[in-house]
Amino acid sequence: MRNVSMTQRISEVVRNTNETKIRVRLNLDGTGQGTLNTGVPFLDHMIDQIKQHGLFDIDIHCDGDLEIDDHHTVEDCGITLGQAFAQALGDKKGLRRYGHFYAPLDEALSRVVVDLSGRPGLFMDIPFTRARIGTFDVDLFSEFFQGFVNHALMTLHIDNLKGKNSHHQIESVFKALARALRMACEIDPRAENTIASTKGSL
């Protein structure tokens, strides 16, 4: 019998283009350890939420064309992190598949729902109260999440339900995402050798 719980769910992805050079190492069954160096400090801060609250070990190093702007780096980090999740999840046997979480941060409240469906889809509603957080363009979060879901092969619903401070809004989103991913990626001990789909595949 295959013991899914003892299988190492670890991946390493290298993605090099003319715009970015990225290496990601991911352990789905970690303790929230790792080093983040995307070159964009606010992006590091957000991915740190995934790492800490999801209990994923994540190492990311990116050399990007930041002399142009942050766009390529943010999008490509989302793509590469998504590829790492897809690779680490493997055949998806035993996965709970679904995850959801509500995360508050002071006045902000966000809900994230995840389905490791194999069907990429991003449905996001974050009514940011300002266009930038420090120097970070909030429009880039949609690029990050779109790249992530396209390559992680998941359906992702993101809703910021309340919030006046843009930093609080997006940080509550990443906290909720971390917890929802943690739930969806867990192995169900009652079904560890089956696929959570009536089709028999994800």
Swiss-Prot record:
Location of this chain's protein in the cell: Cytoplasm
Enzyme Commission (EC) number: 4.2.1.19
GO BP term, example: L-histidine biosynthetic process
Enzyme class: lyase
Superkingdom of this protein's organism: Bacteria
Cysteines paired by S-S bonds: none
GO molecular function, one term: imidazoleglycerol-phosphate dehydratase activity
Annotated GO CC locations: cytoplasm
Keywords (A to Z) from UniProt: Amino-acid biosynthesis, Cytoplasm, Histidine biosynthesis, Lyase
Catalytic activity: D-erythro-1-(imidazol-4-yl)glycerol 3-phosphate = 3-(imidazol-4-yl)-2-oxopropyl phosphate + H2O
Broad class of the protein's primary localization: cytoplasm
Pathway linked to the protein: Amino-acid biosynthesis; L-histidine biosynthesis; L-histidine from 5-phospho-alpha-D-ribose 1-diphosphate: step 6/9
Family classification: Belongs to the imidazoleglycerol-phosphate dehydratase family.
HAMAP family reported for this sequence: HisB
Protein known as: Imidazoleglycerol-phosphate dehydratase
Organism: Acinetobacter baumannii (strain SDF)
Organismal lineage: Bacteria, Pseudomonadati, Pseudomonadota, Gammaproteobacteria, Moraxellales
